[in-house]
């Protein structure tokens, strides 16, 4: 059962990393196109990263309760 938890965490980390990378890359592209919007984009980026990380921490906590 421990091996499945490790596999689930590995897949979750992969998803979190990809999601954050895509988010930050698109924010950087948007800021390059419209530099005057950087403040609002930065706020949205921080909120987006927080939600993505929050999803990971929910999965991390749930792996301790399963099994």
Curated annotation (Swiss-Prot):
GO cellular component, one term: proton-transporting ATP synthase complex
Pfam families membership: ATP-synt_C
UniProt site (Reversibly protonated during proton transport): 53
Molecular function (Gene Ontology), one example: proton-transporting ATP synthase activity, rotational mechanism
Primary subcellular site in the record, as a coarse category: membrane
Protein topology in the membrane: Multi-pass membrane protein
Keyword list, A-Z: ATP synthesis, Cell membrane, CF(0), Hydrogen ion transport, Ion transport, Lipid-binding, Membrane, Transmembrane, Transmembrane helix, Transport
Transmembrane residue ranges: 6-26, 46-66
Disulfide bonds: none
Locations listed in the record: Cell membrane
Record-stated family: Belongs to the ATPase C chain family.
Biological function: F(1)F(0) ATP synthase produces ATP from ADP in the presence of a proton or sodium gradient. F-type ATPases consist of two structural domains, F(1) containing the extramembraneous catalytic core and F(0) containing the membrane proton channel, linked together by a central stalk and a peripheral stalk. During catalysis, ATP synthesis in the catalytic domain of F(1) is coupled via a rotary mechanism of the central stalk subunits to proton translocation.
Assembly behavior: F-type ATPases have 2 components, F(1) - the catalytic core - and F(0) - the membrane proton channel. F(1) has five subunits: alpha(3), beta(3), gamma(1), delta(1), epsilon(1). F(0) has three main subunits: a(1), b(2) and c(10-14). The alpha and beta chains form an alternating ring which encloses part of the gamma chain. F(1) is attached to F(0) by a central stalk formed by the gamma and epsilon chains, while a peripheral stalk is formed by the delta and b chains.
HAMAP family registered for this protein in UniProt: ATP_synth_c_bact
Note: Dicyclohexylcarbodiimide (DCDD) binding to the active glutamate residue inhibits ATPase in vitro.
The protein's name in its UniProt record: ATP synthase subunit c
